[in-house]
Amino acid sequence: MTQPINGPDNPGRCFIGLMSGTSMDGVDGVLLRLDGAPHLLASVSLDIPPSLRATLLALNSSGPDELHRAALAANELARLYAQACAQLRQAAPEARVRAIGAHGQTVRHRPDLGYTVQLNAPALLAELSGIDVVADFRSRDVAAGGQGAPLVPPFHDAMFGGRGAPRAVLNLGGIGNVTLLAPGQAPRGFDTGPANVLLDAWCHAHTGKHYDHNGNWAATGSVSKALLHHLLNSEPWFDLPAPKSTGRDLFGLGWLHKHLDSSGLRLSPQDVQATLVELTAQTVARAIASEPIQDLLVCGGGARNPAIMQALARALPCPVAPTDSEGVPGQWVEAMAFAWLAQAFIDRLPAGLPGVTGARGPRVLGALYPAA
């Protein structure tokens, strides 16, 4: 459903941002005016069709005829992106859109091997939309020795920085990532570990639902301290120093089943779900334990899950609140970031920061696919 956002009539300099995250639950799109403080003009969320979602999930693992299936899936995703763009422009017809920032769908992320793969067909999207498209945001950073992720900390700094006290912004999509903001310092950021990627997969495997609405299913279970301890202490990734990133390549159902088997525990599915909620909170708490932050703002799908928000509030010594509390709807923050990243590319401003990704230096991120 497209949502026009009331605001000033001046159409300004506008960009569209499109994001389909690790959870693969849908495509989020925003139309953002960026001639000053970012101003949200319209937003849209489109479900990913079940057949496309199944294909994208399958492409996260090796299989037959991958290149052919990946190309077809990328084209289908681009058509869905084009639908989102059309709805956004219809909601704010006065806006003059300079470019689209289209992230694509991550199916492999291996910066340790020098590559990251986001399925996308930006040339097709440019053709269908008639608008210049900026895409392939991660590869340039990986080529410079960086993690290629997370990409949102510079945008978090633009939106939530400058408050005079250290704070953090946590994005809880499929994978959690945190941005550390301190007065007079460049933002730092890194992935914290699994969030919705495991919660959604486990819920779907045992209930048939794509996600645990409001954490209601998890609330019927109890946290297993033994399983939580096993997960936190048997996975080497959690102890890696920042900068670091991860994805479904590591934290999928196979990872969870492996650790459930090695733990020797026999738990109900609800208890496992409750423990995964606690795992999300504890990995965040461990990751920022040494940081003198005064508050934590949360965005992404996890911010709409009361079970996760309550677990974070218990695990952290500082106030925890959704970004909505500062007038920025948490559902749209990541899509807004890719509109902002598209502007940064058009203006040739480096958005890949060494303090976030570990790259050899700042880099301009993205590649341009002109509409004509």
Swiss-Prot record:
ATP binds at G21, T22, S23, M24, D25, G26, V27, D28. Keywords: ATP-binding, Carbohydrate metabolism, Kinase, Nucleotide-binding, Transferase. Pathway: Amino-sugar metabolism; 1,6-anhydro-N-acetylmuramate degradation; Cell wall biogenesis; peptidoglycan recycling. InterPro entries: Anhydro_N_Ac-Mur_kinase, ATPase_NBD. It catalyses: 1,6-anhydro-N-acetyl-beta-muramate + ATP + H2O = N-acetyl-D-muramate 6-phosphate + ADP + H(+). One of its GO terms (molecular function) is kinase activity. Signal peptide: none annotated. It comes from the Bacteria. Its EC number is 2.7.1.170. HAMAP family: AnhMurNAc_kinase (MF_01270). Belongs to the anhydro-N-acetylmuramic acid kinase family. This is Anhydro-N-acetylmuramic acid kinase. It comes from Bordetella avium (strain 197N).
